[in-house]
From Swiss-Prot:
EC numbers, comma separated: 2.7.7.90
Keywords, ordered alphabetically: Cytoplasm, Lipopolysaccharide biosynthesis, Nucleotidyltransferase, Transferase
Reaction(s) catalysed (UniProt annotation): 8-amino-3,8-dideoxy-alpha-D-manno-octulosonate + CTP = CMP-8-amino-3,8-dideoxy-alpha-D-manno-oct-2-ulosonate + diphosphate
InterPro entries in the record: Cytidylyl_trans, KdsB, Nucleotide-diphossugar_trans
GO biological process: lipopolysaccharide biosynthetic process
Identification of the protein by name: 8-amino-3,8-dideoxy-manno-octulosonate cytidylyltransferase
Pathway: Bacterial outer membrane biogenesis; lipopolysaccharide biosynthesis
Role description: Activates KDO8N (a required 8-carbon sugar) for incorporation into bacterial lipopolysaccharide in the Shewanella genus.
SUPFAM superfamilies in the cross-refs: Nucleotide-diphospho-sugar transferases
Gene Ontology cellular component annotations, sorted alphabetically: cytosol
Stated family: Belongs to the KdsB family.
Compartment list: Cytoplasm
Pfam families linked to this entry: CTP_transf_3
Amino acid sequence: MNVTLLIPARYGSSRFPGKPLAPINGKPMIQHVYERASLAKGLTNIYVATDDDRIKAAVEGFGGKVVMTSPEAASGTDRINDAINQLGLKDDDLVINLQGDQPLIDPTSIEQVISLFERHPGEFEMATLGFEIVNKTELDDPMHVKMVFDNNNYALYFSRSRIPFGRDTQDYPVYKHLGVYAYTRKFVQAFAALPLGRLEDLEKLEQLRALEYGHKIKIAISAFDSIEVDTPEDIRKCEQRLAVD
């Protein structure tokens, strides 16, 4: 199975401009993401998908591969779709979408979503990762997306709010979403062509579009947490984690 991992990266960010190039222990964040991904088994190719020449130069500077996408891409999925069209992938090729703000992603987490497609061919169109929240401050933080899933590990909903809500107890597991997706090229093209979903627009979560239009998302539960970098403070958290790893 051909497996291409794409890391969408854009320079402009309202909360943290230039985030992909923010230094973490002397290396740009995008390099940490790329190097972590390259340790995962089963990948055919890795590319950074960007529309910014500064990011392109940084990636090529450490020996990485880049595909330049349109600056008109309205979303991360549109950027991924643009990239796979340029790369000429086949309909059944597997695409891994690793968010560019995951500098501490564990390579085995990437292998987990690949394994789902290998073990359950044709049973679902999309797969992603979850992790049981340990840090209680994340429970009500809208930057940490929560998720619920059924007994067969198919996603029921994703939300920036705490889900599920325990009416009579607070002693229950809550899972957060980790920014890794897997899907076939054919599904990415179909997904990108769908109109914006109502719930997607409310929560600002693209994966809800898949659920709103009846597509199944398989969930793997990771044993490893990851830090999503949204602010400069998150950079310091990454450096602290790396210091003890």
